[in-house]
Each structure stands twice: as structure tokens, then as C-alpha cells.
Amino acid sequence: MLSNQPHKSVLLDEVIHNLNIKGDGNYLDLTVGFGGHSQHILEQLTTGTLTGNDMDKDSITFCTELFKDKKNVVLVHDNFANFFNHLKQLKVTKFDGILIDLGVSSYQLDKPERGFSFKHAGPFDMRMHQSDRVPTALDILERLSEEELTHVLKKFGEIAHPKPIAKALKTLINNTKNPTTVEVAETVKAAASNFEKYKSRNYLAKVFQAIRIYLNRELESLEIVLQHIPKLLNNKGRFLVIVFHSLEEKLVRNYIFKLTHFVQPPELPVKLTPPFELITKKPILPTEQEIKTNPRVRSAKLFVIEKK
């Protein structure tokens, strides 16, 4: 059994405040993780319900135990892109608030065997969904050509000079059986050594980010789930999403703009209004105090919109 609350919830107070929770409302946490946000949502419910979704088996196992005495909680184990497919089995199909937290949990980062971190030696895995049918990060490095890997690093890590990194990683894979996360990290650092300003930890993090995003199809999944949000929300229901890097942010900003802005065609006699409105004109950022206690939240941004 996992230890209690192995992950600190990001922007917790801001999320709970902006969900505008009603005691009899129905709420959906599409990235329930280890139940941090969801626990606080539940505290404000009387006759309302909470539905939690996560693709991480450890998270669902933890939350099943955490919420075992809660009759108003339902958990779904799947990629949130597939959540819409589960509606037929659920009693609640429309929600008063939906939350997506796109961050990788501290538990995933700190557990070496999950392979997300370059701080600890472990298998180069990085799977959010630990199914045998899902390839690992190591599988991806083996399958992709040097040219394809270069493209992945540039597109999903926004990495300058990705070619020598890709070349070095392919050489590592060809010459080393089952290299660890630390060996992958050392290879990246060595390949980047000719580019003085790219020796930083941030550069290494971007390489790991690129492979993780590609492996787990994160941006593709985000695009799919965003298409379903308007259909899942009740009128006056709110959608909250926390992003952590520029690729997510760009996708979310474009999505929100389309839902909250409408160009009135001059030939239409009836004035049309967009289906959603912005609750916060600018994204909500972590406080200095939160960043001090949990440095991993420093890049987090919370967007909030409401269905009219």
C-alpha cells in the first residue's frame, strides 16, 4: 500500500475556490491522482457526487482505498481521452465542475522504477498507464530512427540542437542493454556539452519531457478530452485546467479563446454569444509561499472558464 498522500496538490486553495462547489453538485476530477484535490471537493459536498479518473494504476489503487467508505465516489481507470466512452456505465453524465491537472505527480517522479526522473537510477519506462501493451520509453528509443527521434525532441521538447542528442541516444541504445534513466541522462549531458548554455538541468528535463509526451500521447489525449468538455458540463458549470509547459499552454489557450470569443457576422440580425466565459482573464499562478514549499509547482498555471 502506498504511503498517505505521496503527492502535494498544486494550487489547491485556488482550485477549490474557483470550482464554486455546490453541496448537491456533481464533480469530475479527470486526473484524480492521489486524491488531493478530490478530498477537498468531497468535504464540501452534501448530496453531491465525485467521479475520479486516472490512467495510473497506482493512483486508482490508492484512491480506491482512500475513498472506500464514500458512497458518492466513482473511480474510472483509463486515459482521460477515453472517459467519454465510460459514460454509459456511470449514473452521473453531466457535471457542475471538471478539473484537469496536467502535472506529473511527485510520486511518479520520485519512484525510480517508474522511470520518469533522471535523479534516480531506474528502468527507462515513463508509462503513465502501466499496461504491458503500452511501450516503454526504452522501447520508443529502440523503435524510432535517429531522424524520427530528432523530430520528437524538437517538437515535444522544443530543444535546440536535437540532432546530436538523438544520435547519442541511438548509439547508447545500440551499445547498451537496458540503459537506466541515469545512463540516459549522462548520455544527454555528454552530447549537449558542446552547447554551453544547454548544459543546464532544464535542458535535460526537456529531453525527458519530449520522450514522455510522445510516449504517452499527452497532447493528442488533451486535444481529445477538450473536445468533450462542453458536452460534459451543466450550464454554469466550470472547467479548470492546470498546465505546466508551453506546449500544453498553447493548446489550452487556443481552446479557451475559441469557447469564449465569437465574431458576430454582420449579416446576422440576432446577436450570438460564445458558449463560455472567462472567470479569470489571466491564468492563476502559485504563490511564492507554495513555490517555496513545493518548487515543482513554479511553472503551473490555472485556467478557469464557465459554461453559460
Swiss-Prot record:
GO molecular function, one term: rRNA (cytosine-N4-)-methyltransferase activity
GO cellular component terms, A-Z: cytoplasm
Location within or outside the cell: Cytoplasm
SUPFAM superfamilies: Putative methyltransferase TM0872, insert domain, S-adenosyl-L-methionine-dependent methyltransferases
Annotated coiled-coil segments of the chain: none
GO biological process entries: rRNA base methylation
Keyword S-adenosyl-L-methionine recorded: yes
UniProt keyword Transferase, yes or no: yes
Binding site for S-adenosyl-L-methionine: 35-37, 54, 80, 101, 108
Source taxon at top rank: Bacteria
Family membership noted in the UniProt record: Belongs to the methyltransferase superfamily. RsmH family.
Alphabetical list of HAMAP family matching this protein: 16SrRNA_methyltr_H
Function text: Specifically methylates the N4 position of cytidine in position 1402 (C1402) of 16S rRNA.
Record-given protein name: Ribosomal RNA small subunit methyltransferase H
Organism: Mycoplasma pneumoniae (strain ATCC 29342 / M129 / Subtype 1) (Mycoplasmoides pneumoniae)
Gene name of the encoded protein: rsmH
